[in-house]
């Protein structure tokens, strides 16, 4: 409200989007009473939801890493593991408490394990009965390299940094099943752990799925003006939308689900709504990525800026 003083903000749960009546149904307050809000223009930016049901047990025995709340949950859980590991006399329990498994070797997985490794190093000074050698970190990736979205050079650098930091890397390995204190891998191995963090699996929001909006590959289909197909006054941006991007014929034909693209989409969408109300021609979404960056923790990072690979301290600073 402080950042957007001229905007009416409502903290509520979206129950339904009624495209025929042009309204949104909300549940608000302690009693979750239903309210209808009519719209002239509807902007959908709900993102995607985690889909942990793709692997048996993952949904019930793992943390996700998609929101700030997820990050706080993982942080508090890890501190709790340190607290118990510092005082327990059960060696098997202590080993399990200090085993951390991250599933997924893309941007989210690499950044998660890098930051957790750094955080754990800082925590050690407060827990005298835990040594650095007792901490074990594992990252599991189905592909044959970390950060498969980037070049082999960047992937190899990331691999070498993680190996130096004694992070166990399981490439060309799938997660088969998860139980309450164990993960089972496709290579026949299993890892006992109290901490499983999943950075894989996305699916369309339930609200979007039930609304009748046109979908492709779990995303809302839009035109180049960010309008939902066949619905001129309904707009969609961000991870929940499949938005054409025709800037370069060699580019992937749709916008990738990154914050960099979402910010540009939001700015254009605001202009297009104004243009539509003024009955003027709308502007197409055209944007070329400036690159991608990932933090590896300990003042190291990797990424690609335009055509240049960057790594180490420079990438971390950027």
Where would I find each of the regions flagged by the language model?
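Short, well-ordered coil/turn residues at beta-beta hairpins
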Residues: 27, 45-46, 171-173, 199-200, ...
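A Rossmann-like FAD-binding core segment of flavoenzymes
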Residues: 12-17, 117-224, 228-230
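FAD-binding core/adjacent interface of flavoenzyme oxidoreductases
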Residues: 7-99, 197
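C-terminal, flexible cofactor-proximal segment of oxidoreductases
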Residues: 261, 265-318
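FAD-site-proximal beta/loop scaffold in flavoenzymes
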Residues: 60-91, 182, 190-264, 271
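Short glycine-rich anion-binding loops that position phosphate/pyrophosphate groups of nucleotides
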Residues: 47-50, 113, 202-204
